[in-house]
Curated annotation (Swiss-Prot):
GO terms for biological process: thiamine biosynthetic process; thiamine diphosphate biosynthetic process. Its EC number is 2.5.1.3. One of its GO terms (cellular component) is cytoplasm. HAMAP family: TMP_synthase. 4-amino-2-methyl-5-(diphosphooxymethyl)pyrimidine binds at residues 37-41, 69, 108, 137. Pfam families: TMP-TENI. SUPFAM superfamilies: Thiamin phosphate synthase. It comes from Klebsiella pneumoniae subsp. pneumoniae (strain ATCC 700721 / MGH 78578). This is Thiamine-phosphate synthase. GO terms for molecular function: magnesium ion binding; thiamine-phosphate diphosphorylase activity. The gene is thiE. Its cofactor is Mg(2+). Pathway: Cofactor biosynthesis; thiamine diphosphate biosynthesis; thiamine phosphate from 4-amino-2-methyl-5-diphosphomethylpyrimidine and 4-methyl-5-(2-phosphoethyl)-thiazole: step 1/1. Binds 1 Mg(2+) ion per subunit. NCBIfam families: PRK03512.1, thiE.
Length: 211
């Protein structure tokens, strides 16, 4: 039963692009995306704070669900919609501070054991990956494939879920057929020959999420 310790999110978050710049955030919001994540890696808080502020302001302007990856203290300081954390971040993050600030929490998982860890934290949503091989990020685990993804979805029942990892426009229908509430994409948009057309097609498949 879905009883998160953090503010809830809709079961269907829809198309969920993960991007590394404010420019991409703005483009995608203008294109109709309403769930997205700013993921900037390996920089100090002071180096990313201006980007976080700008991204949060854009998210508010478009009434979007903007998650900040990793920089949870900045997300709290500037009142983001939510924070997304990897498994390795759970132990070093003050989850109670995120909860008390009223931010939503998403957590990455890669297998059943990590799903157990995520469920213990009772986040707003659980990300399941990586579904297919991906070049975007070095992954220590093997791709899960659609069969494993479907099993996780069945196990999590009414918990909001996000599939991530190697999801292309061609593979998106099969991923969505598992019943997952959202698909997170990176290169399917940012490396597309025509990013706007790719975004439109992915939105047509996955939707922009429930209100």
């Amino acid at each position: 039963m879905y009883q998160p310790d953090f503010p809830p999110v809709p079961f269907r978050l829809g198309l969920y692009p993960v991007v590394d710049s404010v420019a991409w955030i703005e483009r995608l919001l203008e294109a109709g995306v309403r769930t997205l994540q700013l993921r900037i890696k390996d920089r100090r808080d002071s180096e990313v704070e201006d980007d976080v502020i700008a991204a949060i302001a854009l998210g508010r302007r478009y009434h979007a669900r903007l998650f900040i990856n990793d920089y949870w203290q900045l997300a709290i300081k500037h009142q983001a919609y939510g924070v997304h954390l990897g498994q390795e971040d759970l132990e070093t993050t003050d989850l109670s501070a995120i909860r008390q600030a009223g931010l939503r929490l998403g957590v990455s998982t890669h297998d059943d054991m990590e799903i157990d860890v995520a469920l213990a934290a009772r986040p707003s949503y659980i990300a399941l990956g990586h579904v297919f091989p991906t070049q975007t990020k070095q992954m220590p685990s093997a791709p899960q494939g659609l069969e494993q993804l479907a099993r996780h979805i069945q196990r999590l029942a009414d918990y909001p879920t996000v599939a991530i990892g190697g999801i292309s426009l061609e593979k998106a229908p099969g991923v969505l057929a598992t019943g997952v509430g959202s698909i997170a994409v990176v290169s399917a948009i940012t490396q597309a020959a025509d990013w706007r057309a790719a975004t439109d097609q992915l939105l047509a498949l996955a939707g922009a999420g429930d209100e």
